[in-house]
């Protein structure tokens, strides 16, 4: 993951890249990365930054809040952070077509890898869709020499247990977009996956 190259900041204090990234995370989300137990990796950032996860009343945030509500958890995005659940996107640039090309996924890998490196206490990584699966498999293969999730349909694989080191890796479906309004079965399956994730981290329904 991102190197520990040391940088100087004001006051002469030395900080490595992970410390700088952690300070950025705390400043942006008002949450210590050490408290994060779950990362949900979605597909790609929205075309408009105002639609992203941590913008109040955005389309992305409403999708997540609705899915957690279906799973029995009534909360907003900040409350999810307080529970130790962080949501991000695998691809850091908006998609320009329905299928995201591999080169675009690869262009965001370093940033995603550095993002995941912030969280020392992860228990679960949820891969929300095929793009997240591809991106995470590439990171895992770089680190360990092999994929975490094998080839196959999400429907057939989502009930299997996979691990990256000692972190449970769960395969699910994209958690944003208009398809959620149409494909009610996927909403049900995502909510089931969220319930399983909550049971793994020991969170109870409210």
Model regions and ranges:
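Alpha-helix capping/helix-boundary segments
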Residues: 131-133
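Short secondary-structure boundary/capping segments
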Residues: 30, 77-79, 159-161
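Short, surface-exposed acidic-centric catalytic microdomains
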Residues: 54-104
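A short acidic (Asp/Glu
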Residues: 51-52, 135-139
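C-terminal capping/extension of enzyme domains
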Residues: 2-23, 94-113, 118, 138, ...
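Active-site and ligand/interface coordination hotspots across diverse enzymes
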Residues: 1-69, 163, 196-206
């Amino acid at each position: 993951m991102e190197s520990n190259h040391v940088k100087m900041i004001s006051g002469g204090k030395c900080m490595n890249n992970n410390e700088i990234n952690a300070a950025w995370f705390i400043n942006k989300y008002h949450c210590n990365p050490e408290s994060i137990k779950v990362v949900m990796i979605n597909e790609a950032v929205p075309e408009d930054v105002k639609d992203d996860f941590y913008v109040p009343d955005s389309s992305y945030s409403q999708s997540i809040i609705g899915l957690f509500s279906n799973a029995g958890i009534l909360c907003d995005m900040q409350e999810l952070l307080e529970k130790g659940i962080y949501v991000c996107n695998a691809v850091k640039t908006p998609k320009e077509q329905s299928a995201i090309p591999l080169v675009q996924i690869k262009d965001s890998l370093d940033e995603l890898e550095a993002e995941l490196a912030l969280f020392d206490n992860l228990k679960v990584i949820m891969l929300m869709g095929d793009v997240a699966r591809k991106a995470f498999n590439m990171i895992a293969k770089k680190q360990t020499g092999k994929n975490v999730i094998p080839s196959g349909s999400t429907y057939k694989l989502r009930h299997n247990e996979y691990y990256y080191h000692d972190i449970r890796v769960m395969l699910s479906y994209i958690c944003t977009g208009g398809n959620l309004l149409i494909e009610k079965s996927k909403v049900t399956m995502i909510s089931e996956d969220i319930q399983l994730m909550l049971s793994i981290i020991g969170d109870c329904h409210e």
